Every structure is written in C-alpha cells, then in structure tokens.
Amino acid sequence: MSCIKMKDKCRNFSLSKWQDTRKPWLILIIVTIGLTCIAHFLFQEYLFMKPCEQCVYIRFDMLVMAIGGMIALINPANNIIKIFSYSLAFYGIWLGLEHCLTLNHIHEVVHSENPFAGVDGCREIPIYPFNLPLYKWASSWFLPTGECGMDTPVVPENAYNHLNAFQKFFIGTPPDFENGLYSNGWYLIPSLKFMNMAICCLIAFLCCFVVLFAMFIAYVLDKNKPNAKIFALVIVALVLVLKFIGESKNPNQNIASLNQVVLRYS
C-alpha cells in the first residue's frame, strides 16, 4: 500500500503547484542560513579561518536569497509576493556566482607559480550593494579579516592552551599547526586538495539556481495563471535593476594589493 501511495504522490506532483507552497522556500532558507552560520560559527569562530573580502560577500549573497525565501513564506501563491521573493533569490544567486568565480580565480593565482597573473587585489573595507555598511552593523559577520585566497587557520597565541581534540584534528597542534586536516586550507578532500571553498559554494549557488529556475519556468508556463508571464517579466526587470543599480564604486576605499598578500606568505 505504501508503494501505491508513493506512486500516486509522484503522479500527482506538479512543480507549478509545489512552487506555490512554502516547502521549497523553507528549504532555501534553511540551506542558505545554515551555510552562512557554518561559515561564521564553525570555520571562523571555532576553527579560526578568517574570512576574506569575497567570503563576506558570499555570506551577503546567501542572506539575500534567504530574505527572498522569508518573503515567500508570507503567501507563496501571491503574484506580488512572488515578484519580491524570486527577484531577491535570483539576485542573490547572480551575485553569489560572480563572487565565487572571483574567489576561485584569486585562490588559483595565490597558489600558482605566477602569483601576479591578473588579479587586482583585495579590499580591506568591503563595498556592498547600495553601499550598505554591513561591516559596521555586524563587523564579526561582514568585515573581512583574512587575506584573499588564503584560508588556512590563524590561531591566536592566547588560544594555544585551550584547543580541544576536535579543533586540533582540523587545524593542527601548536605552535606550527602543520598536522591538521585544514592546515593547508579548506578543501572538500584536503589530502587531494580537491574542490576548494569557492568551488563548493559555486556548486551550492548553481544547485539553488537550477531548482529556482525550474520553479520559475513552471510558474510561467502554468495555464491556470494567465498573468504569470507579465509578472515574470517584472521579476526579470527587477533583478536587472537590483544588479546594475546596486553596484557601487568608491575610489576612497582602501585596497590591499594582492602582490603584498602573496609576498607576505611567500
């Protein structure tokens, strides 16, 4: 009987109907906030991996997507709500993909034999969309304290005698910290240096995009929603507006040269 019920559920499943429910948006919120909290509490606070400029941007991108999901929870079937929820979700994904690709490029350059191959540098003070001073509002979350492309643990001396076995397993033992799982930086498979943090985050954003884009297309093609195409155009337009108006450039921001970063660690 359970198999029959499962087949009936699969047969009656509609992506268009599903995107009108709170479930996909709740999953989006859990994933994005969960990853952001892991980055902050586990990697930054517990394992002493300081975030760089692109890292804090990726946190912002994740939270933008989460805000879109929270808005959708109000009434996911409402077209006006959809405009804001889809727009913020796609906007966050767009930013996230850009920042992940930038971070991966920096990571490859820093760890290559030619460390001066076309990377502009790393800002000490980040520039967020619409000049949001997030680094002032929540500095522990959004102010970069690490070097670009260098995600090795930086353990303060006053913590040497307070490390537990779990921390030592990942970051190593003092004073050199060379025998930890992440002593050479974070990788999905550290022994092979396979898939750095930027690539893993890139995959996460791509997975979110695939699911959301499928939901979006199902919404647009739903015959029971005659105005869906109009609202879809509004969503696309709003994403473009957010992306291009939100970009800001402040020449007075302090920029640390990548050359100095590389020389410091060479």
UniProtKB/Swiss-Prot annotation:
Bilayer-spanning residue ranges: 25-47, 62-81, 198-220, 230-247
One GO term (biological process): protein folding
Membrane topology: Multi-pass membrane protein
Listed GO CC annotations: plasma membrane
Major location (coarse): membrane
Signal peptide (from-to): none
Keyword terms, alphabetized: Cell inner membrane, Cell membrane, Disulfide bond, Electron transport, Membrane, Oxidoreductase, Redox-active center, Transmembrane, Transmembrane helix, Transport
Cell compartment(s), UniProt: Cell inner membrane
Pfam families membership: DsbB
GO molecular function: protein-disulfide reductase activity
InterPro entries in UniProt: DiS_bond_form_DsbB/BdbC, DsbB, DsbB-like_sf
Cell division in keyword set: no
Alphabetized Gene3D superfamilies for the sequence: DsbB-like
Organism domain of life: Bacteria
Cysteine disulfide links: 52-55, 122-148
Quaternary structure annotation from Swiss-Prot or TrEMBL: Interacts with DsbL.
Family to which the UniProt record says this protein belongs: Belongs to the DsbB family. DsbI subfamily.
Reported function: Required for disulfide bond formation in some proteins. Part of a redox system composed of DsbI and DsbL that mediates formation of an essential disulfide bond in AssT.
Protein name: Putative protein-disulfide oxidoreductase DsbI
Native source organism of the sequence: Campylobacter jejuni subsp. jejuni serotype O:2 (strain ATCC 700819 / NCTC 11168)
Name of the gene encoding the protein in the UniProt record: dsbI
